Amino acid sequence: MTDDKTTPARASAKLPRGFGDRGPAEIAATEKMLAAIRASYELYGFEAVETPFIEFTDALGKFLPDLDRPNEGVFSFKDDDESWLSLRYDLTAPLARFVAENFDKLPKPYRSYRAGYVFRNEKPGPGRFRQFMQFDADTVGAPSVAADAEMCMMAADTLERLGVKRGDYVIKVNNRKVLDGVLEAIGLGGEENAGRRMTVLRAIDKLDKFGPEGVALLLGPGRKDESGDFTKGAGLERTAVERVLNYVAAQGEGTAQMLGVLRASVAGSQRGEEGVAELAEIAALIDAAGFSARIRIDPSVVRGLEYYTGPVFEAELTFEVQGEDGKPVRFGSIGGGGRYDGLVGRFRGENVPATGFSIGVSRLYSALKAVGSPIVSAASQPGPVVVLVLDREHLARYQGFVTALRSADIRAELYLGGSGMNAQLKYADKRGSLCAVIQGSNERDHAEGARVTIRDLALGAELAGASKDRADYLELRAKAQFTVAEQNLVDAVREVMARRS
């Protein structure tokens, strides 16, 4: 007879491309970042709201199901009632649904912030993930571009609160209406050209990544990347490509001259001229508030999402870091936003003015590490005090030590593995513990009453490199390990912790 039983295949312990794990240090640093961003947003009068990870696909708006599944860009699946559901690809579209659903109950303007993970079903690459964290703030119900100017000011203040020095960043502002005026001038006006307009805008959005030559290919026939993948272009004629690139590269000495350059580029387009007028108003508000050195008009800013309808802005870090090829490169964008007056209106049949700003938390974490911000470079908190288990028949007694420490607001854990004393001490050291609590039969049966041994793990490590002077060595050893009465456990642990505070 033969045994038909087969060993099941072992599961592969690896992540899908574009996803990553985070350890305690990164989580702690991220929490500090979120706290700083939250404090800045709240200083400007925004309040928290939270929406779920999953929405109806049609509520997200931009991506709709085709015959088999929703278009690329989102992770989607069918519910048991045949409805398409999707993981959110940003935090703005879910906010629009929330505002529309609760419109009559919310104050207007409605000022809110929210943080969380978003998901993109896109090709991953270096620094490009399928799951990443954003932190948004939005004002809904404010038609004035003063709300857009405020977003830019808040973005600047938030970066400085996070430890980015003035001069190491710039908030760049443009207006989709100006871009629309340029596109009208090259024959891409009207609803029939909406798709090509978005292709052009997304091509311009890649200027920092691909440079003018790469953008020219995306505006024209298309571009093939290093892997051989081909991205279809907008199919513009050469003269139209040159006109778009000339607009994007437009420069001016100061705001007034830049506005003049933009007016000339949209001459004859009512929508384009309206956009330039809005930029002029934003510039005046920024100057009056004292932010003109930190915020500037830049025609290369487009933002890649379709729902923007007016001013758009981008937070860019201007310092250089080492690129993948070892050469210095500008760090680039870590957030952005803009006006989206039609997004809430999709649910209400009328436009509702809205504007917002989003920080890419995951990308910003890398940036703050690069500039040595104390928010992410500060040492992580020590591990818990570890109570060793030397005699399992006294487990309840050891648990009592842990409870006493926790009752005193001291992080503590009972060792729950099956190893001996030396391995337990190594475990405590790996956990980053400041000290370990030890009680064997010698301490428990002490003539003067039950005692515990406190081992200062950091001082213990220093003993190896201690002075050869015997008196100094003995003094250090006495501090590194000492015994106290059981009832003095908490005070003794606090003494050790105070040495490292």
Swiss-Prot record:
Keyword Ion transport: no
Keywords for this protein: Aminoacyl-tRNA synthetase, ATP-binding, Cytoplasm, Ligase, Nucleotide-binding, Protein biosynthesis
GO molecular function: ATP binding; histidine-tRNA ligase activity
Cellular compartment(s): Cytoplasm
GO cellular component: cytoplasm
Cysteine disulfide partners in this protein: none
Coiled-coil portions: none
Reactions this protein catalyses: tRNA(His) + L-histidine + ATP = L-histidyl-tRNA(His) + AMP + diphosphate + H(+)
Subunit (UniProt): Homodimer.
Similarity annotation: Belongs to the class-II aminoacyl-tRNA synthetase family.
NCBIfam families: hisS (TIGR00442)
PANTHER family tied to this protein: HISTIDINE--TRNA LIGASE, HISTIDYL-TRNA SYNTHETASE
Name of the protein in question: Histidine--tRNA ligase
Source organism of this protein record: Methylocella silvestris (strain DSM 15510 / CIP 108128 / LMG 27833 / NCIMB 13906 / BL2)
Lineage of the species this protein comes from: Bacteria, Pseudomonadati, Pseudomonadota, Alphaproteobacteria, Hyphomicrobiales
